[in-house]
Amino acid sequence: MKKLLVAVLILISAALFAGTVSVIGPWSGVEMDAFIPVLEAFKAETGIDYTYQTYRAEDLANVLPAQFSAKKSPADVIFMWSSFITSNTKSIVELTEVIDTDAYIPGALDNVTAADGAVYGIAYTAKVKPGFWYRKSFFEAHGLTAPSSWDEFVALLEKIKATPGIKNAIASGNGVGWPLSDVTEHFLIAFGGPELQKDLIEGNTSWTSYAVRNAIGKLVYLIERGYFSEPTEWTTILEQWWNGEYGLYFMGQWITGMVDDSDDLAVFSLPGSRGMVFSIDYAFVPEFAANKTEALELVKFLSGEKGQSIQVSQGGHIATVEVYVSNYPPVDKEIAKLTEGVETVNDLDDSIGGLWQTAFWDQLKLLWVRPERLDDVLMDLEQKMPE
């Protein structure tokens, strides 16, 4: 009788939430394939069906304002830039009392929180820029270990530099000036704290301040001593690093899908760093959603431990709420451990954007080959900051 009663209650619960929720997200191909299991699990738990379509954020930025003006929405749950969410709160459902905001890691919801503290979006999973990657086999072959202090880091670079066949200790990937920018941000966060990165983004700290010069000065110290290679196209030098021409390579989490054997990968952050750049996927529920009740159930699921556990188990994602480390594939477990106790920080040049971003990239390319020009570089960056 009890089993029958439980079964009936489950059926009633499913019936209460019967319906369909439409979702717009940025993922296609294999990335979409990794997201669908999350939606399937949501469907199995709630009885709510779903539809999913891929839409670029750049295109949504043109479509959504007109839709909202007509009190319409192309979907019930939409993944979109955080800046769009906070700029359109009149057309977006407040989620402060819908999701468990306390479950998030520090800083994860900052970008979708209004000045009055109201939360208008969820922080789904993220990709992070954790630090310096190395091949376990390379470290084992040469008796190397990850550092736990700045002095140990410098000593490690010296050992790698002295290894036969090594060109430089650290491979300097480059394109338009990225990923040199990611390396620089890592030093700003490690030696100036997450607060320095946030203050620079908000324009509350000068690029010529002691805090900035001290942090980037640490980077310049390493460049001057030849530990970093000359900037080289980032996928080309990635292959060279993998083949043993360099010992370390700073890159985001997506590197795990770009090498032949991700099980041979390991990573460490600069010792003592209290923050890490997270590239978080944000989502919101429009006020004009056709299936608002179902949409709110989905965002609760996506912002919870169960939904995010399923996503991270697919690989290439880090949860923004606490999940068991056992849910991660092997290489992502190491990244997840590095994120414990650290604060999420926005990408610096992406946040400031505009002409300043290209100036930042250009100045870093200069800094890598002319490190003695540090003061000129910082002055130029300060002068070009948007007002």
Give the residues covered by each predicted segment.
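Conserved C-terminal helix/tail region of periplasmic/extracytoplasmic solute-binding proteins
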Residues: 44, 49, 140, 224, ...
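Mature extracytoplasmic/periplasmic domains
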Residues: 92, 257, 281-355
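Conserved N-terminal structural module of periplasmic/extracytoplasmic solute-binding proteins
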Residues: 18-85, 101, 146, 253, ...
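Extracytoplasmic/periplasmic solute-binding protein
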Residues: 120-124, 130, 154-202
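Short, solvent-exposed loop/beta-turn-alpha elements that line the ligand-binding surface or hinge
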Residues: 94-111, 170, 174, 191-214, ...
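Hinge/lid segment of periplasmic solute-binding proteins
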Residues: 81-130, 267, 333
